[in-house]
């Protein structure tokens, strides 16, 4: 039986007292977003662009609050410039990134950014953990929250499933 990774990740976020959940709507994060929206101790903030999430997270951290940024790999390109601020200022931020452009991807436009995502994040000083199995996600998230540095947990497309708009 496949673990309920969104429930486990929500539990890890709650245990670490994450209070702000910033996200651009994404089907891969849908269940986790719903759990966070239903949690009275968390404030869910829908973004118009992923870049806004970096600023929100920095402000939250400066104000003493923990946050998480949920996005799809295609949105990583939108945060490249401001992600450098995390390293320069020593601001910890957890990003949970659902991957696109991997094996089985039907949308060829997703492939270049999907392939570039780990390297782009690393070039900006973000530590990258890749979860290829559902049971790896929550431990990677909990570990990132304990170490308080800029970290991206990449969730393989094999875990979240291949999107298909042809059905």
Regions found by a protein language model. Name each.
Residues 1-167:
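Thiamine diphosphate
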């Amino acid at each position: 039986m496949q673990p309920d990774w969104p429930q486990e990740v929500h539990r890890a976020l709650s245990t670490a007292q994450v209070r702000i959940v910033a996200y651009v709507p994404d089907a891969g994060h849908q269940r986790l977003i719903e759990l966070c929206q239903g949690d009275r101790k968390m404030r869910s903030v829908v973004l118009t662009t992923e870049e806004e999430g970096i600023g929100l997270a920095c402000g939250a951290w400066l104000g003493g609050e923990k946050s998480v940024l949920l996005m799809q790999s295609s949105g990583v390109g939108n945060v490249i410039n401001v992600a450098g601020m995390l390293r320069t200022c020593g601001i910890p931020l957890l990003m949970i990134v659902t991957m696109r452009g991997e094996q089985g991807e039907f949308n060829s436009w997703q492939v270049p950014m999907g392939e570039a995502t780990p390297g782009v994040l690393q070039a900006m000083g973000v530590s990258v953990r890749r979860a290829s199995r559902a049971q790896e996600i929550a431990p990677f998230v909990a570990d990132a929250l304990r170490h308080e540095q800029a970290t991206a947990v990449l969730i393989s497309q094999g875990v979240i499933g291949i999107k298909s708009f042809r059905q």
